[in-house]
Amino acid sequence: MKTLKPALLVSIVLLVVCGLVYPLVLTGVSQVAFKDKANGSMIEVNGVKVGSELIGQSFTDARFFKGRVSSVNYNTYTKEDLVPDKDGNTSYGGVSSGSFNYGATNPELHDRVQKDIEKFLKDNPTVKREDIPTDLLTASGSGLDPNISPASAKIQIPAIAKASGISESKLQKIVDDNTSKKLFGVLGEDRVNVLKVNVEVAKILGLI
């Protein structure tokens, strides 16, 4: 009993400190010092949340910039994806993230890349095959990457300008204004947030 009592007290104290006090303190500090980041780095337009700058979205409209390839289609689905097959399975498996995980010699990887190249060239007829930036043809580890390289954004501008009626110079300024530089000038890569640039495009088009 003498050894059981201290062990029980320690367990209760640790439970309160680690399970209640510590999380509450961290939550309080984060809400005061980093409120925006602590709440998911949400992007709001006219008081309405349109997404997070940390999670990519699927854009199919020719007037908007496209993100990277996603093995989970940026976790979006259609009504058809919810229709079960003869075995009762649906195309949409619930909230998910991840990559294709194809090996370099896997024929499915080659086929997927070729299809993506052909689609991109069809949507961007002024672009040459060899000029397509690599990140537009490769999937991120999560399949939810919100960013593309400045080169990937720039190469889409002519087609977007034609579809939207927005001048190429104005689109380039939108890209420049939403480009984040390398951390400390050396860590990571310059990147463009796809949702942010598309929000600006939508504003010019009067959609939001």
Curated annotation (Swiss-Prot):
Topology class, membrane: Single-pass membrane protein
Disulfide-bonded cysteines: none
Entry keyword annotation includes Transport: yes
Cellular component, GO, one term: plasma membrane
Family of the protein in this entry: Belongs to the KdpC family.
Function: Part of the high-affinity ATP-driven potassium transport (or Kdp) system, which catalyzes the hydrolysis of ATP coupled with the electrogenic transport of potassium into the cytoplasm. This subunit acts as a catalytic chaperone that increases the ATP-binding affinity of the ATP-hydrolyzing subunit KdpB by the formation of a transient KdpB/KdpC/ATP ternary complex.
Assembly: The system is composed of three essential subunits: KdpA, KdpB and KdpC.
Name by which UniProt lists this protein: Potassium-transporting ATPase KdpC subunit
Species assigned in the record: Clostridioides difficile (strain 630) (Peptoclostridium difficile)
